[in-house]
Design a protein with these regions (language model features):
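Conserved beta-strand hairpin/beta-sheet module of binuclear metal-dependent hydrolase folds
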Residues: 1-47, 122-134
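Glycine-rich, flexible loop/turn motifs
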Residues: 2, 15, 89, 95, ...
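Short secondary-structure boundary/capping segments
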Residues: 8-9, 20, 66, 83, ...
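Active-site HxH/HxHxD metal-binding segment of metal-dependent hydrolases
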Residues: 12-13, 27, 33-111
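Short, flexible coil/turn micro-motifs enriched in small/turn-prone residues
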Residues: 20, 58, 91, 109, ...
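Short glycine-enriched loop/turn motifs at secondary-structure junctions
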Residues: 22-24, 85, 138-139
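Metallo-beta-lactamase
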Residues: 98, 116-166
Length: 166
């Protein structure tokens, strides 16, 4: 599994991610707000973005979807309850579902409500453990609950799921 972290350099201070299979060159774009940087990085690396995963429905995570889909034909994946909130969603996922990238990469979906009630994190099923946490968890703390979230749900996500991860 190759992970390319892309700094957006915007006021939101977001990171976008490309997860690529080294064997096939297929890539998953996670929250590709800065579609130009995501598309350019994939092109330079020789990867084909085939899927987009939105961790939740906020615009700073979904705003680049249309441009990436137009350029690549990628399928949009998000929480199953976000179907009416994320335009062009092709696949709804829930806890335990697996997103496959290329031949061997498997990312398990965790239903992690709190920041929003349609939030998911991805847990890597490779030799390199990783958690792609969207706005649930930051290096300096937890995500906020200001725009459609719930503090009790966020607390439960931390206690019942994230704290138990290896």
């Amino acid at each position: 599994m190759i992970v390319e972290r892309i700094w957006t350099g915007n006021a939101y201070r977001n990171y976008n991610y490309l997860i690529a299979c080294p064997e096939t060159g297929e890539a998953l774009a996670i929250d590709p707000l800065d579609h130009e940087k995501c598309l350019n990085t994939a092109r330079v690396k020789g990867w084909q973005i085939t899927q987009i995963l939105n961790t939740h429905e906020h615009h700073d995570h979904t705003g680049g979807n249309a441009a990436v889909v137009a350029a690549t034909g990628a399928k949009v994946i998000a929480h199953h309850k976000a179907a009416g909130k994320i335009a062009g969603m092709d696949r709804g996922v829930q806890a335990g579902d697996v997103i496959k990238v290329g031949k061997h990469i498997e990312l398990e979906c965790l239903d992690t409500p709190g920041h929003t009630m349609c939030h998911i994190c991805l847990r890597s099923h490779t030799d390199e453990p990783a958690l792609f946490s969207g706005d649930t968890l930051f290096n300096a703390g937890a995500g906020n609950v200001h725009n459609g979230g719930d503090v009790n749900a966020l607390y439960a996500t931390f206690v019942e799921q994230l704290a138990r991860l290896p």
